[in-house]
């Protein structure tokens, strides 16, 4: 028995987006790799470059905050897509903007930006843009039922 006001999708009518789910899966693995590499890059910068300590600490704290935002965004996006729910998918759409802003910060505004970081953050922005487009299309499909 469903709670009052909730209804399931009609039998045989699946509106979940397979391409979106594939992007969420790939982005999850990419994010795990990204955050590990970024931690090693910060270690490299802290040891070999004249990186101000306050800036290094700020960048690492922002990286941990970014990790939290990404995990929550991917969780709600996957949950909303697979359960065909608008609210979790909408939360994921809303969290895409802070996520893209953090990727842009690491791409453009750090004290030192290495070429590897520029490439990695460009890929992150591609994932954010692709997922945002597919999330909006999936939300439109969910709104039709």
Curated annotation (Swiss-Prot):
GO terms for cellular component: ciliary transition zone; cilium; cytoskeleton; cytosol; membrane; MKS complex. Its main location: membrane. One of its GO terms (biological process) is non-motile cilium assembly. It is found in: Membrane; Cytoplasm, Cytoskeleton, Cilium basal body. InterPro entries: Uncharacterised_TM-17. Changing residue 73 to H: In JBTS2 and MKS2. Keywords: Cell projection, Ciliopathy, Cilium biogenesis/degradation, Cytoplasm, Cytoskeleton, Disease variant, Joubert syndrome, Meckel syndrome, Membrane, Retinitis pigmentosa, Transmembrane, Transmembrane helix. TMEM138 and TMEM216 genes are adjacent and are aligned in a head-to-tail configuration. They share some cis regulatory region and display coordinated expression. Genes were joined by chromosomal rearrangement at the amphiboan to reptile evolutionary transition around 340 million years ago. Part of the tectonic-like complex which is required for tissue-specific ciliogenesis and may regulate ciliary membrane composition. It is linked to Joubert syndrome 2: A disorder presenting with cerebellar ataxia, oculomotor apraxia, hypotonia, neonatal breathing abnormalities and psychomotor delay. Neuroradiologically, it is characterized by cerebellar vermian hypoplasia/aplasia, thickened and reoriented superior cerebellar peduncles, and an abnormally large interpeduncular fossa, giving the appearance of a molar tooth on transaxial slices (molar tooth sign). Additional variable features include retinal dystrophy and renal disease. Meckel syndrome 2: A disorder characterized by a combination of renal cysts and variably associated features including developmental anomalies of the central nervous system (typically encephalocele), hepatic ductal dysplasia and cysts, and polydactyly. This is Transmembrane protein 216.
């Amino acid at each position: 028995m469903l709670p009052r006001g909730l209804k399931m999708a009609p039998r045989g009518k699946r509106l979940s987006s397979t391409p979106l789910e594939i992007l969420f899966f790939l982005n999850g693995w990419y994010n795990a790799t990204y955050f590990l590499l970024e931690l090693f890059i910060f270690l490299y910068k802290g040891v070999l470059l004249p990186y101000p300590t306050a800036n290094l600490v700020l960048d690492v704290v922002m990286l941990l905050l970014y990790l939290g935002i990404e995990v929550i965004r991917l969780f709600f996006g996957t949950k909303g897509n697979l359960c065909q729910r608008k609210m979790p998918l909408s939360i994921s759409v809303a969290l895409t903007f802070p996520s893209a802003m953090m990727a842009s910060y690491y791409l453009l505004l750090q004290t030192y930006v290495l070429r590897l970081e520029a490439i990695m953050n460009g890929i992150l922005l591609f994932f954010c843009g692709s997922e945002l487009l597919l999330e909006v299309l999936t939300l439109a499909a969910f709104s039709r039922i």
